[in-house]
Amino acid sequence: MGTVPATRCVRGFSRAVRRRSPFTAILVFAVLLFQLACKSLTPIDTKPLDNAGIGYSAIKELKAQHITATEVSEIAKVRQAGLSDEDCVTLLQIFHGRGETFTAGDAIASLHQSGMSEGTVLALAGMDQVGLGYGELQAMHLAGLSEAIVLEVARHHAAGTPALSGASLGTLRNLRMDNGTLLELVRRGIPDSEAAEIIAARRHGSTDAEILRHFSGS
């Protein structure tokens, strides 16, 4: 008989815990929501933007685009590399327009510091060509290939269509082929599989005009 009250007590405690469980879950959920709300209301520290030389109106525009703490440091890199306030705002618009976080600060800074113009850098960003493959485009520019060629190669990459590689174009440039001829070969969509033949023809004395006549593309 002495064990019955103890059993009833345990059962009563279990029922009490079960009754409190929904309330406990709701309380925990409410606390989490409160923490998230506080975090979202915490103002972004834009001091790095100010230190990078970005003006008040541009910072205001960046805030209006809901710039994140991570993006603040990336945009600061771009501004420190010499791009304008307007360029910084445009870059954030481009990435957010694709539903992406702006993480290309190093790539864009490197491209611009290599001598590439603001317009070309922005165009590459618009084509989503400032990711892992940007190094080839930068190397092409440093090899003396025109920005028009760099952009045309980037367009083919973005479209997934054939184009001569940066290495092949650099070799042809070293063989004194004109930038205009190289641009036309890229426009024609000459695949890199034909590069060896073009290089051999050039080394055997073929002129720019002869090469353009022979390699008509698709």
Feature-to-residue mapping (PLM):
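N-terminal secretory signal peptides that target proteins for export/translocation
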Residues: 1-19
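Bacterial N-terminal signal peptides
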Residues: 24-35
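General marker for long, soluble alpha-helical cores
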Residues: 37-218
